[in-house]
Structure formats: structure tokens, C-alpha cells
């Protein structure tokens, strides 16, 4: 009877150890994500810490609040994003994730805010390059901001060139007609 209880106790302890190990194990990330940087820091309550992102392409910012609560604000318009001025944000208690699209202008401003509910917050942010290829359900006809911007620049330049050519043509034609009218009259 004692041997049976001993086996049950050993199985129970082993299960507890496995659960404990799994909770401390690194979080799984997709194979397509390549780790570029790991940034650790501390931030006081109500303060900001600013970082700059220069890497091109799709970037994933994964921040874990180790102590306290740090929030994440991202912008391609300003290098000092805040809770008043940002394009992307993640303000959860614990893990914050922001996906920075490839079309964002570089450098991208990253603001880390220490929530006032804690005197000091500690964070660890992992910066990943996302190599996933997006499959658009409508193929080439789908919206691609980078391609649209390039096409708009091309169409504006061809319109400007044709307007310039027309303008020069009409200027020369009017000049010749004025010359003919002066000679005749």
C-alpha cells in the first residue's frame, strides 16, 4: 500500500515540476520571426523612454513587463510617441506586442511609458524581423500601400510631363500665329 502511494506522490510531484518548467519556458515564436535585438530597461512612473527603429521590413516588437506595467507606443510620424500621439500601441498589463508594417517610414519612434500605478517598471523588449509572406486573397488586385504610392508618383510624373509638352506646344503655336498676324497686318 505504501509503494502505491509513493508512486502516486512521485507522479504528482513530476507533473508539478513539468508544469512549473513549462511556465518558465521561453514563449514559442513563429519560425518566420528572426530575433534582432533584446532591450531591457527600467522606467519610472509617468515617464517615457524613447528608442529608434531603423530596420526595414515588417518588424514585431514584443515587450514583457517584468515588474510593474510598461506600455508601448509606436509612430512613424514622430520619434517621441506618447499616449496622445501615436500610430500603433499596446497597453496591456504584462506582454505587449506591436506589428510594425513595412510601409512605415524609418526611423520609427518607439515610446515606452511607465504606468503611474507602479513606482518603477522593468521591461524586456524583443525585436523580431517578420519574414512571413502575406498571401492576398485577391492576388495582384489587392491593396498594397507601397505599390500604390509608387504608382501614384509615376502617374503624377507622366501627367506633369504631358501637361508640360502641351504647354510648350501651345506656347510655340500661339507665338507663330502672333508673328503671322503681325506680318499680315
Swiss-Prot record:
Keyword Glycoprotein among UniProt keywords: yes
Compartment annotation: Secreted
InterPro entries given in the database record: UPF0669
Organism: Gallus gallus (Chicken)
Record's keyword terms, sorted: Glycoprotein, Secreted, Signal
UniProt key word Secreted: yes
Pfam families listed in its UniProt record: UPF0669
Signal sequence interval, chain numbering: 1-23
Entry GO CC: extracellular region
Positions annotated as glycosylated: 47
Disulphides: none
Domain of life: Eukaryota
Protein name as it appears in the record: UPF0669 protein C6orf120 homolog
Family indicated by similarity: Belongs to the UPF0669 family.
Cited PANTHER family: UPF0669 PROTEIN C6ORF120
Principal subcellular localization: secreted
Amino acid at each position: 500500500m505504501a509503494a502505491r502511494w509513493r508512486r502516486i506522490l512521485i507522479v504528482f510531484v513530476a507533473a508539478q515540476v513539468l508544469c512549473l518548467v513549462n511556465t518558465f519556458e521561453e514563449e514559442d515564436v513563429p519560425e518566420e520571426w528572426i530575433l534582432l535585438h533584446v532591450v531591457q530597461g527600467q522606467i519610472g512612473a509617468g515617464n517615457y523612454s524613447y528608442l529608434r527603429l531603423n530596420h526595414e521590413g515588417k518588424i514585431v516588437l514584443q515587450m514583457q513587463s517584468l515588474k510593474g506595467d510598461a506600455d508601448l507606443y509606436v509612430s512613424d510620424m514622430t520619434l517621441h510617441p506618447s499616449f496622445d500621439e501615436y500610430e500603433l500601441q499596446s497597453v496591456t498589463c504584462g506582454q505587449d506586442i506591436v506589428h510594425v508594417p513595412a510601409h512605415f517610414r524609418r526611423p520609427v519612434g518607439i515610446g515606452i511609458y511607465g504606468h503611474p500605478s507602479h513606482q518603477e517598471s522593468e521591461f524586456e523588449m524583443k525585436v523580431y524581423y517578420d519574414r512571413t509572406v502575406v498571401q492576398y486573397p485577391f492576388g495582384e488586385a489587392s491593396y498594397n500601400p507601397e505599390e500604390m504610392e509608387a504608382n501614384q508618383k509615376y502617374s503624377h510624373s507622366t501627367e506633369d510631363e504631358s501637361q508640360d509638352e502641351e504647354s510648350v506646344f501651345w506656347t510655340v503655336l500661339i507665338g507663330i500665329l502672333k508673328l503671322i498676324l503681325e506680318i499680315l497686318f
